[in-house]
Amino acid sequence: KRIANNGSEPISLGVLAACGLVAVVAGGILGGSGKLFAYGSTFREGYTRTPAPGVAETGPQPKEALAAYMKKGEKIFSAKCQGCHGPDAKGNGSTFPSLVGSAWANGETERFAMVILNGLEGPVSDGKTYGVMPPQGIGMTPEELAGIMTYVRNNFGNTKGDVISVEMAKAALEISAARKNAGKSVTAAELTADHVKALPGAVLDPKTMVDPMTLLPVGGKKP
């Protein structure tokens, strides 16, 4: 019988089988490591990890409400409104009305919200007579509605100086869903009869500091 040098003995099949089993188990654990080591899954809901000592917390810096809402609204206007009303919101003078100085945009907030969310059917007059406006509210979030309303009312020469808060926008979505003709465009008659009023909800001071992503107050306001 040949005697092998010390340290060069052949590995037994039992050892190889055990190593293979360990490799399979380890692979299964590491394969699910996305959840095992995921911050959102490892810690309970609502837990917030604090930054290490001496390390500044990252994230968007708070902004004044009016500026933050306007920024959000600018994106929505470019995506949903600019195609018809134009980049300057002046319309084309025939089919698409101007939003500059518009009583519809600058007037009662519930009426304005209903037009944005549901569209407008039938002739309406704002110095000139216009026809149909398609609805823009499909999939629109309260933050987006609040942003676009605030943006239009404080841009293009409009100077309302107010903020349509997320709370007010949520109320608008609820009012829209509860309409008798929910799912259909509003008419001038319906607007006059039911929606010439201010949206309910807490009024947000334009100088209140908010999270620019959620548009929710983060405490205090800029002096």
What are these regions (language model features)?
Residues 128-131, 135-138, 142-223:
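Flexible coil segments in periplasmic/lumen-exposed cytochrome c-class electron-transfer proteins
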Residues 65-92, 105-118:
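Sequence/structural segment immediately N-terminal to covalent heme-attachment motifs in c-type
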Residues 89, 120, 153-157:
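Activation segment of ePK-like protein kinases, specifically the conserved APE
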Residues 1-44:
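Extended surface/linker regions that mediate inter-domain or inter-protein docking
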Residues 45-77, 92-95:
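Electrostatic cytochrome c docking/interface patches
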Residues 98-114, 134-146:
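Electron-transfer interface patches adjacent to heme c in soluble/periplasmic c-type cytochromes
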Residues 124-126:
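Short, internal strand/loop/helix patches
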Residues 83-86, 101, 165, 171:
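Disulfide-rich extracellular modules and peptides
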